[in-house]
């Protein structure tokens, strides 16, 4: 499953595995016959099918058109105006995302995001909600976890492409941005991450082991950036420049 887009329909032991490939080119399906009275499976079959020579259903097409129009109105909302384009891997854009997270939780000292969470650039000129959805396209929320300094350092060392704010990297150490002091291996820090990381994605499986009671803020991981952009009140006459 996951992101491999491999067309699969097969049985392994008593389990049927199904997966379609990308862009709705095909699908996998299974058929089950079940005896409810005897609470038993009578028969099962599975197959893969290609989407060929299909035609749209008018009722479905109208429904899709209705919601597409409504979505386009929402996504066209203007959030600001950027002085230049910032690529997804640009530290300035990465920093803007994680620093916006810290603004929703004054008790948090550190925020960590995986770099690949950003999937599109911030464009030059008008910035709309659609641009931010493209930038942060996944349905992740922000988690708050309690980690010791030693655990924070382990997460940064083991995770895939971390971008961190609240800490300053020196040649050999990490300093707390608020105090300028070395991170204390034994002290507990409140750290903000995204739910994908808490679930173990991109090599961050240690986080949930360190704090099995992580708090899901239920705040979408792109919302703080949206709010921050609106707060900047940027325009063509006063364009946004990321530090």
Where are these regions (language model features)?
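Short, charge-rich amphipathic segments
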Residues: 29-42, 79-95, 151-163, 219-222
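Short Gly/Pro-enriched turn/cap motifs at secondary-structure boundaries
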Residues: 20-23, 88-92, 133-134
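Hard-cation-handling environments
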Residues: 44, 54-127
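Feature captures C-terminal
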Residues: 96-243
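Active-site-adjacent helix-turn-beta-strand microarchitecture at beta-sheet edges
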Residues: 1-74, 163-164, 169-177
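A near-ubiquitous, low-amplitude feature marking generic local secondary-structure context
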Residues: 15, 50, 54, 58, ...
């Amino acid at each position: 499953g996951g992101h491999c887009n491999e067309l699969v329909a097969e049985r392994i032991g008593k389990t049927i595995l199904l997966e379609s490939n990308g862009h709705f080119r095909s699908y996998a399906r299974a058929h089950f016959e079940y005896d409810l009275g005897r609470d038993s499976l009578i028969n099962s079959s599975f197959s893969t099918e290609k989407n060929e020579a299909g035609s749209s259903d008018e009722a479905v097409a109208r429904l899709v058109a209705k919601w597409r129009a409504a979505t386009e109105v929402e996504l066209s909302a203007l959030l600001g105006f950027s002085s230049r384009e910032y690529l997804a891997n640009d530290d300035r854009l990465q920093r803007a995302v994680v620093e916006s997270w810290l603004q929703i939780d004054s008790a948090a000292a550190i925020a960590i995001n995986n770099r690949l969470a950003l999937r599109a650039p911030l464009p030059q000129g008008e910035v709309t909600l659609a641009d931010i959805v493209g930038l942060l396209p996944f349905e992740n929320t922000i988690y708050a976890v309690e980690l010791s300094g030693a655990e924070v350092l382990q997460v940064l060392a083991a995770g895939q492409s971390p971008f961190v704010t609240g800490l300053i990297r020196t040649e050999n150490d990490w300093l707390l941005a608020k105090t300028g002091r070395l991170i204390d291996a034994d002290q507990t820090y409140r750290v903000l991450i995204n739910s994908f990381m808490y679930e173990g994605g991109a090599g961050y499986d240690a986080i949930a082991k360190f704090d099995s009671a992580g708090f899901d803020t239920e705040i979408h991981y792109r919302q703080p950036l949206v709010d921050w952009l609106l707060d900047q009140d940027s325009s063509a006459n006063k364009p946004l420049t990321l530090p």
